[in-house]
Amino acid sequence: MENCMIRNTGYFLTIFFLAFISFAVTCSGTNQKDNVDRLPVVYEDVRIGLVVDMGSMEGKLVTTSISMALSDFYHVNNGYRTRVSVLSRDSHGDPLQALAAAMDLLQTEQVEALVGGQSLLEAKNLAELGEKTKVPVISSFQVPSSLSLAKYNYFIQATHDTSSEAKGIAALFSNFDWRTAVLIYEDDDDWRESIQPLVGHFQQNAIHIEYKAEFSVSSNEECIMKQLRKFKASGIRIFVAHISERIANRLFPCARRLGMMEEGYAWILTARSMNNFQDTNYLAKEEMEGVIGFKSYIPLTEELHNFTLRWKRSLRLEEVVTRMSVCSIWAHDIAWSLARAAEVAKLPGLSVYDLLEAIPESAKHKGLSGDIKFIDKKFISDKFEIVNMIGRGERSVGLWNSGSFISNRRRRLSSTKALETIIWPGGSTRIPKIRSLKEKRHGKKKKLRVLVPAGNITPQILEVKTDFKTGVTAATGYCIDVFETSILPFNYEVEYIPWPGAINYKNYNDLVYTLYSQKDKYDAAVGDITITDNRSLYVDFTLPFTDMGLAVVTAKDKSMWIIFKPLTLSLWLTIASFFILTGAIVWLIERHDNADFQGSCFQQIGTLLCFGFSTLVFAHRERLQHNMSRFVVIVWIFAVLILTSNYTATLTSVMTVQQIRGLKSNENIGFFSASIAANVVNDNPTFQGPRYKGLKTADDFTNALRNGTISFIVDEVPYVKLFVAKHPSEFVIVETESVTNGFGFAFQKGSPLVQKVSREIEKLRRTEKLKAIENWWFQRQTTSATSEDTFHPLTVYTFRGLFMITGVSFAFALIVYLIPWNREQRQVVLKHFHRYVSHRFAREIRPSPTTPNRQNENSVI
């Protein structure tokens, strides 16, 4: 029993000892693991350079937003091997200092990406630097999407879709039936370039920009008031403003003092303007009551709310900002995309320059600004909120999205014409209407300032005279008559302003550019202005009121051999051959029984030829006795009748058109050296080959055609018609080519008169009043031989069917005639052959008895 207890005690001691050893080892391993866990983790640093104006509110907001965004990102993704660190530099708002700061970051800090570009020039400089150093440059500021930036492969931009915004503003105008507006924008490259999409969509939707005004940051109140008084006097009530907050804080108080923030007016602000506004100037906000603005749409989410609260707490007390700007929200999303891209780019096997390629894939996430779209190196925001400024705040009245719906709770402008109620300036809810003050003056005509080229050398087309005593300019001519007839229904008083430089094609380009660049001085241009593609970039043209294209003129042909021109030589020879063949066949049939076809050899040849050619005038005197000869003559007379009728018709055409000749490569062609024809003949393949000579006046044309120096004249159709009308007996229009677009009236881009005048021109053409005006000034209808009227001689191929029928008929007559003759001749030949064979056979059997005697005589001799 005692031994058993001793054994059990030893057993338990052994187990206890082993358990103790195991526990000690376990504790030792745990301590080692804890020591390992407490070792510092090494992250790979990815340096990003930030170049902003630290003194600007926007620069401060973006810097704070990026810092907080990276902190939040790595708090959520603490397992990432990389950490993005931001190294900031102050650009002080100077593009050159921004470039120097970026170069310093690249050289001293070896940053792998740059964030910055608060202006267009600054963005271009950084983009050029990034292109040379192969470092991505990202801009979260609202720099316009310029074509000059699109060429940089390493430049990435966060921006709103200006094209979608322009469509939205144009749709807003259509919704309220507005067709004219005043465009106010900031006099700066950034703002000037970013307004171009809106101008283009206004033109496409026939919305006329009545006036444009540029205000710079240095513009004082006196300058602004002067422009606003001009707009108020014009009667235009709809304004579109594309300006920064600094200019807006001066513009709207001035507008209110002039009574332009009262009922009947409408002000629309673009997205770039609204996105940059901060809630710092409450008095300026109150001055903007009733304004409508487009803003980049930022969805109200819990994440945005929480981030905004923490962001406000991070600001210093002196920085009073109630909400984040759009740029700072975009900067937050860009920071998250950069952090994701840095992790992907630093994976084993990838180079440091793969950061650019990793950004598009890393941008596919939902940020504070909503679903991020990365299209063509741009973070695109294409959703816009339409807000109405009320008091010190703003109220959403609708959404604009060129794609799909954003929310079912709000109305979308693209799906319905009804927005929520808008409080317009003056507290009115009635939609402002376009009513020009000039239209309110009962019976008084509106003035239309029209440029006319004073140096025209063709008074029938346009002539400008100025009375130096009164200073009044009068214009007459075909172009003026058409214009005044077209503009008559619209109650305009036309003031003609002479343009002294219009003496050649290039100066006409200058005339068009003057109309484009001096919109406050001129409304339209009238004259012999050819519609061209490059001119259409600057002005809007009406429908052409003249024939389109160039015309070719030549002298009328007065050759004495013109009677032979209707038929080709081969056809003349073929007809002559058939005349002789007809006489020969008739002679062959009639010569045995008809005494008229008998006689000596020369008499028979003369009869054969006279009979054949006399069928041309149906005057043959010989009486025919055989039916086959009569058949031959009837068929040939039928053919002659067809040939003579076609010859007569063709000769008539020849005498009318006067043998119009085609252009040959060895003939000289003249053109007016100062007209558009000088450009066209050198560029168009239709006129390649001939030698061209530039002439200066109509007298030069006349003399050159008369003495043969040139064979043809090429010029625009109206000039050619006028030239031929002066010399109808000498010259004729040969051909026309539609290589120019004719003359048109030029108006300012977007002018509503373009469509109205075009409709009147079409009405004049349909009622033939346009033709009557042309005939009045050109004296008579010009004879024109177009390509359809140009003479083409008749050929053998034209009458191949007729000659085939005639030939078959002649062959048939010969065969019928020769069958009985062959029978008689065959009998005679057989008879003679039989006699010859019989005689020959008899001589071989019975020799003649006289043969031996003759042989003996020969031997004796």
Curated annotation (Swiss-Prot):
- Using the UniProt record, give the first listed, main subcellular location: membrane
Give me the Extracellular side stretches, as residue ranges. Answer: 30-568, 652-800
What is the organism of origin for this protein?
Arabidopsis thaliana
Protein name (database record): Glutamate receptor 1.4
Which positions are tagged coiled coil?
none
Q: What is one GO biological process annotated to this record?
A: intracellular monoatomic cation homeostasis
Task of the protein: Glutamate-gated receptor that probably acts as a non-selective cation channel. Can transport calcium ions. May be involved in light-signal transduction and calcium homeostasis via the regulation of calcium influx into cells.
| Gene Ontology CC entries for this record | plasma membrane
> By its UniProt entry, which Pfam families does this protein fall under?
ANF_receptor, Lig_chan, SBP_bac_3
Which residues are noted as glycosylation sites? N306, N534, N707
Question: What InterPro entries would the database entry show?
Answer: ANF_lig-bd_rcpt (IPR001828), GABAb_receptor_plant_PBP1 (IPR044440), Ionotropic_Glu_rcpt (IPR015683), Iontro_rcpt_C (IPR001320), Iontropic_Glu_rcpt_pln (IPR017103), Peripla_BP_I (IPR028082), Solute-binding_3/MltF_N (IPR001638)
**Which keywords, in A-to-Z order, does the entry hold?**
Glycoprotein, Ion channel, Ion transport, Ligand-gated ion channel, Membrane, Receptor, Signal, Transmembrane, Transmembrane helix, Transport
Select a single GO molecular function from the record's annotations and give it.
calcium channel activity
